[in-house]
Amino acid sequence: MKKRWLCGTMAVVIGAMAMAGGSGGNSSSSASAAGTEAADSGSSVDTSGAEMTIRVAHVCGTGSPYDYGANAFKKLVEEGSDGRIKVEVYAGDMTTDEVECVEMVQNNNLEIGWVGTGALGGFVPDLGIFELPFLFEDEDNVNKALEGEFGNSLLEQLSAVDGITGLGFHEDGWRNILTKDKTINTVDDMKGVRMRTMQNEVCVATYEALGATPVALASGEQFTGLQNGVVDGTDNSALYAVADGYIEVVNNICDIHHYYSSGIIVASSKWYEGLSEEDQKLVKESAIKAGEEQRAWFLENDEAKIAEYEEKGYTVTRPTDIDAWKEKVAPVYDKMYAAHPTWEGLVEMVRAAK
């Protein structure tokens, strides 16, 4: 799902980059040409001594969680190469969307994209598994799963797509339930609650299983939907609820972490394969490390944001009947296993990653 975070300042940058042949400015022109030349030749040219600039783009604004991760990657690559490789981060609301950002990467018009898994579901349907409720136990389970067999399996599938190389995972946040009037403390409190959801088979089935009434609304309609009573609640991390503004029209936060949203750092295969083995290793390891740093940053800052709004007078509940919630949504797993036979094995990988 596309997020808007202080967006607007970079509205036309990515489109302009594509029209200009991928140049993100004078500093990136020679680097882009060098990377493209190596890729076009189909050779394994040793670029380990060459100066270059890597452009990283995402659809969120400066200071967003995506931007934090992209800049962590920038720092790691620049320090790891002793300044030989420069990284330019393009943060802002693009005139396109995340899917088009992925297509730019795939077409070698952009080196690296920082995107959500939703933008990649059309390429790898198994990425839809992140919508399963209570898939992960906690952050430790997330880290071990993404860095182990589960994550490797998904990255391998993605890297088999023509033009795309999956480098690693980043964070899109734990989602909690935010409601305008009704306080949610137990699973029974969900009965009859009109919950905004994406038009997604897993999310719709989940809220139906919980006894709520799912209402499909676009991300940008959440504020007015809550304000006008079209829906009673929505779900997201506190950070994004604040960024998107609808934290101002809810009064309750159910800190339950029922969904975990992930993102993936994708690279242009043509560009990446044109790098030396040394530079490939640096880029890959930096992406993985940046993802780890961003996940830790996101969790800490999201919890701090919840505490901040609790101090402001918001009602914050932390349900203890998690097993009852999981029991309610168990049929969703059975339904999705029937529709997506590969998901059961992937869930087993997650469960084993402890």
What are these regions (language model features)?
Residues S23-S27, G42-N141, F150, S159-K354:
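N-terminal secretory/targeting leader peptides
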Residues A145-L155:
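Signature of the catalytic double-stranded beta-helix
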